[in-house]
Swiss-Prot record:
NCBIfam families listed in its UniProt record: PRK09355.1
Binding site for ATP: R120, T166
Protein name: Hydroxyethylthiazole kinase
Gene3D superfamilies: 3.40.1190.20
Requisite cofactors: Mg(2+)
Single GO MF descriptor: ATP binding
Function: Catalyzes the phosphorylation of the hydroxyl group of 4-methyl-5-beta-hydroxyethylthiazole (THZ).
Organism: Herpetosiphon aurantiacus (strain ATCC 23779 / DSM 785 / 114-95)
Matches recorded under InterPro entries: Hyethyz_kinase, Ribokinase-like
E.C. designation(s): 2.7.1.50
Highest taxon of source: Bacteria
Positions of substrate binding: M46, G193
Amino acid sequence: MLTPSSIADCWHSLRQQRPLVHVVPNLVTANDLANALLAVGAAPIMAIEPAEFSQLPNRALVLSMGTPTIDRMQLLAQAGRAAQAKNLPIVLDPVGVGATVWRKQAALALIATVQPTILRLNLGEALALLDQTGVAHGVDVGHAWHDPRLVAGQLARRYGCVVGLTGVIDVVSDGMNWIQLEHGHQWLSQITGAGCIVTSLIGALAAVINDVMLATVSAIAGFGMAAEVAAMHALGPASFRVALFDQLGAIAELIDNSRLSYRMEQHDAD
């Protein structure tokens, strides 16, 4: 059963176990992801040499498509295959997948190769993977006329994974059930890398929690709560960013002392 205590327990387990999380980052947010993982108690390694991949004692893999090139997509695929061989959870963030036809085709090929355990993305990116939108401008394009709960469920069923869809409304789905989370702050859309940070936190929790649905929900809920508290101590997006990193290290305590706001239901049959 989903409760504040079950989510807080995930974060306590993370800090106790301090798992090594392998992140193949994009060129924009690598430093943010490393610092976020350190803040919550994980141990990040941002290895990009394929010869190392099979040798790393990592317990999860996080892949970011944010700055794709042909060589970089091959690198992501190699990291994914190494994680598959070790039976590790793989979290994929198909950043800006709707921006160009090339990027979308590259993302689809990567998904087919690595078969991610979890996809973390926004609504516009999800629609691109479902072929329900054309080329998008930017990575945070919204589509208000689509129900994110239905989109998340469709995506989860199509690719056989858990989907963490973040934005104005956060939804997590395994294709059968969906959980809508109601935490966060508008300033998250005004700083670079918020979504990428959530992706890395999902990877950290999936490293210590076998229930990947719970790990994804816990990461998104905890990050949203941290953002809410950070906003109380900030004057604007710049100071909010600093305050957010301060709060990441206290997520378990925030959840213990906060009201978890969520809805959970089963998807209707198609």
